[in-house]
């Protein structure tokens, strides 16, 4: 446990940021999973789910939670599976 006041604050803010980052990554993964399931089932709303998933992937990459190449790979897989 840190003794310096600013270090104590950093621990607190890091915990908050970590929780936010984990939540955002989980939301992205869920959106991708729902989109892939909709594509597999050929659901009526698959275009909408793919659009939402791509948006969440872009937001996650923009926040540097995943690498840009990984984001591009996920989006490419969604688009090619949707055809």
From Swiss-Prot:
Segments passing through the bilayer: none
Keyword Ribonucleoprotein: yes
Domain of life: Bacteria
Pfam families registered for this protein in UniProt: Ribosomal_S20p (PF01649)
GO-annotated molecular function: small ribosomal subunit rRNA binding; structural constituent of ribosome
Keywords noted in UniProt: Ribonucleoprotein, Ribosomal protein, RNA-binding, rRNA-binding
Cellular component annotations (GO), alphabetically ordered: cytosol; small ribosomal subunit
GO biological process assignments: translation
PANTHER family: 30S RIBOSOMAL PROTEIN S20, SMALL RIBOSOMAL SUBUNIT PROTEIN BS20C
Family: Belongs to the bacterial ribosomal protein bS20 family.
Job of this protein: Binds directly to 16S ribosomal RNA.
Name under which the protein is recorded: Small ribosomal subunit protein bS20
Protein's organism: Staphylococcus carnosus (strain TM300)
Organism ancestry: Bacteria, Bacillati, Bacillota, Bacilli, Bacillales
Gene: rpsT
